[in-house]
């Protein structure tokens, strides 16, 4: 791999496999050695300082650079060199306790210098150059070496983040908090239906936030229709009149709230001294980014590091007339008309969530699915969700088919044609067709080839290791990489990345045991492995499943929600070979997200079944059911829970 430095005072032969070395100058009065990992900001600054000094004193100073690929390899070198340090600098030298990049020492005589700030002080003292006649004073050295770096910076920015979603914003603000000069680029290309939005990415504008608010509206509608009378509420003396749902009012209110969030994000960036540019970013080379805007034109900026956080967009429907379909980019922003009778195409969580809240608001809804529901989730839980949506919510599923064509009728409705699983040609008219067949990473416009960034050919997403791409100064986070497509994951990985780049942290993102919730009419929360994955990974004989059905107390007065077909369900997947260590947790019922957050912490702490059931529950809450799980699947025992 890398070459070793043959004439260094320290013996480096035993770790040469970890080292990349670049010889700068030789045979001069004093030679300085700089060891560090190549994207470390302090190491880069130290190299800029010595470059300036070399220009001042080309005949008196020499520099050798020991360049490591990453922080871990640098630390391995430090540890392996402790014996050499003790011999060269003394067992009580500060070198023995120095653990950060850069590590600087000099020869003639052998002297440990320290880090970046120590190096600058060393030059200011004049020791390094000896100050012979005609040489600059220490103050002049300090002034020249500092201005040589500051007046002509190598890059416009320390970090450019391409993408203004929550992951990109978290990364940029964290980097700025460590004194880095940061720029965020964010421009939303309108959807095929013309929908665009402000700062904050998918989650804030067309994802988590509007979805959760509209889901809540749907739940309120269900309570009004099915539960309110049972709980003593009447809307007139005869109990017949119910409120009328107003889609346009709901969308306007949600829109107003989202715009306040967009504005707050801009204010927050400004307060953190992060430059915000409403431009589309693409690569010219690994350190140069082109900014484009259809009205503002183009320009270029340079940067030391880049984080790609552009997220993903809905996949387009490819059948004839697919352009008539709206996507999740559009459904929350339909201000001019309500959805009406809707066909949802897809079996993803987006498809089922949208179908659920539209039905809850009183619209007729059908869902067309090609294969199984919620492919990446536990399939028993997915089937239970499908059963609930069909039996309890009244949503019809058109299974094992895809649309053959969509055409617009004279009355503005959309005529959808398909072939059912029996081979019969079918057609039906809808007011809205919602395409939710998946999402693709938004990478086509980035010019990744110009920066040497490689994609996973199977998924189309950027290949990374610890968020670092195939180009060392370019990183990627969020939906654009092969990781859980969840906003908190993007936020956490972005924040931790900045801490590693600019605050000497070594904490990596842990993508295991990440909680998530699907906001279908009956909510589903999960963390860890599915039953299928657990059996495949550890063997069916080593897996024990504890499970139960239950009816939440708040559902007990309503005959509609008390029926057995919609009873809630909990499943805990355990490894019998490891003290019933919990591998996966699955919850189907109200407030699933609130229940799952605590379980996520428990799973990160590697809790066991015994610890769970020995915890005192809160009565009478649905989460209390976790503490009284007794029935195993292998026993075949009944799982119907009793009431309070």
Can you name each region flagged by the protein language model?
Residues 106-136:
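Non-catalytic, surface beta->alpha helical segment in thiol-disulfide oxidoreductase systems
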Residues 159-162, 281, 289, 300-311, ...:
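Short hydrophobic core segments
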Residues 140-148, 208, 308-364, 368, ...:
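Glycine-rich dinucleotide-binding loop and its adjacent helix/turn
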Residues 323-339, 428-503, 594, 598:
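FAD-site-proximal beta/loop scaffold in flavoenzymes
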Residues 149-157, 174-339, 369-375, 380-381, ...:
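Glycine-rich flavin
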Residues 128-159, 177-178:
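Extreme N-terminal leader/targeting segments of oxidoreductases
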Residues 162-167, 171-197, 209, 213-219, ...:
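Flexible, glycine-rich terminal cap/loop adjacent to redox cofactors
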Residues 8-73:
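Local sequence-structure signature of Cys/Sec-based thiol-disulfide redox active-site neighborhoods
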């Amino acid at each position: 791999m890398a070459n070793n430095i043959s004439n260094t005072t320290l013996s480096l032969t035993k770790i040469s496999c970890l080292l990349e070395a670049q010889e700068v100058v030789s045979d001069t009065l004093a030679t300085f050695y700089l060891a560090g990992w190549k994207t470390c900001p302090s190491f880069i600054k130290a190299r800029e300082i010595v470059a300036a000094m070399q220009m001042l004193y080309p005949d008196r100073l020499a520099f050798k650079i020991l360049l490591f690929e990453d922080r871990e390899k640098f630390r391995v070198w430090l540890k392996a060199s402790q014996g050499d340090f003790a011999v060269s600098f003394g067992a009580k030298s500060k070198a023995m306790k120095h653990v950060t990049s850069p590590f600087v020492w000099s020869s003639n005589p052998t002297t440990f210098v320290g880090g970046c700030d120590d190096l600058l002080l060393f030059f200011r003292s004049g020791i390094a150059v000896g100050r012979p006649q005609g040489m600059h004073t220490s103050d002049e050295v300090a002034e020249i070496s500092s201005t040589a770096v500051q007046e002509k910076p190598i890059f416009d920015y320390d970090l450019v983040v391409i993408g203004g979603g929550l992951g990109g914003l978290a990364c940029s603000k964290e980097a700025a908090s460590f004194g880095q000069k940061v720029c965020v680029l964010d421009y939303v290309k309108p959807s095929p239906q013309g929908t665009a939005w402000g700062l904050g990415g998918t989650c804030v504008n067309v994802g988590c936030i509007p979805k959760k608010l509209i889901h809540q509206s749907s739940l309120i509608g269900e309570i009004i229709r099915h539960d309110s009378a049972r709980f003593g509420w009447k809307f007139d003396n005869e109990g017949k009149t119910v409120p009328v749902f107003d889609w346009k009012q709901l969308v306007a209110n949600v829109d107003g709230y989202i715009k306040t969030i967009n504005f707050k994000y801009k204010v927050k960036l400004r307060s953190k001294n992060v430059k915000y540019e409403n431009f589309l970013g693409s690569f010219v080379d690994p350190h140069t980014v082109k900014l484009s805007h259809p009205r503002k034109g183009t320009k270029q900026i340079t940067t030391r590091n880049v984080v790609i956080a552009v997220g993903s967009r809905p996949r387009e429907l490819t059948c004839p007339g697919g352009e008539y379909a709206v996507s999740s980019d559009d459904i929350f922003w339909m201000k001019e008309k309500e959805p009406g009778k809707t066909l949802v195409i897809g079996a993803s969580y987006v498809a089922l969530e949208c179908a659920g809240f539209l039905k809850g608001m009183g619209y007729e809804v059908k869902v067309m699915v090609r294969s199984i529901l919620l492919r990446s989730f536990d399939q028993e839980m997915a089937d239970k969700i499908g059963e609930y949506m069909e039996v309890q919510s009244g949503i019809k599923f058109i299974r094992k088919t895809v649309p053959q064509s969509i055409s617009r009728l004279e009355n503005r409705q959309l005529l959808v044609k398909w072939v059912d699983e029996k081979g019969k040609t079918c057609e039906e008219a809808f007011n809205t067709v919602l395409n939710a067949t998946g999402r693709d990473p938004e990478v086509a416009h980035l010019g990744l080839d110009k920066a040497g960034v490689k994609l996973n050919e199977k998924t189309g997403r950027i290949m990374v290791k610890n968020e670092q791409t195939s180009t060392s100064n370019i990183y990627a986070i969020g939906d654009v990489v092969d990781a859980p497509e969840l906003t908190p994951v993007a936020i956490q990985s972005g924040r931790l990345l900045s801490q590693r780049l600019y605050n000497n942290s070594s904490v990596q993102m842990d993508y295991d045991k990440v909680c998530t919730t699907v906001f279908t009419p009956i909510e589903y929360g999960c963390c860890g492995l599915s039953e299928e994955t657990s059996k495949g990974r550890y063997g069916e004989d080593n897996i024990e499943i504890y499970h139960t059905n239950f009816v939440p107390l708040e559902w007990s007065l309503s005959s509609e929600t008390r029926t057995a077909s919609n009873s809630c369900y909990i499943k805990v997947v355990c490894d019998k070979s490891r003290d019933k260590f919990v591998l996966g947790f699955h919850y189907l019922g109200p407030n699933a997200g609130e229940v799952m957050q605590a379980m996520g912490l428990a799973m990160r702490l590697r809790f066991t079944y015994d610890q769970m059931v020995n915890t005192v529950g809160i009565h009478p809450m649905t989460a209390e059911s976790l503490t009284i799980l007794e029935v195993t699947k292998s026993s075949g025992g009944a799982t119907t829970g009793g009431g309070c």
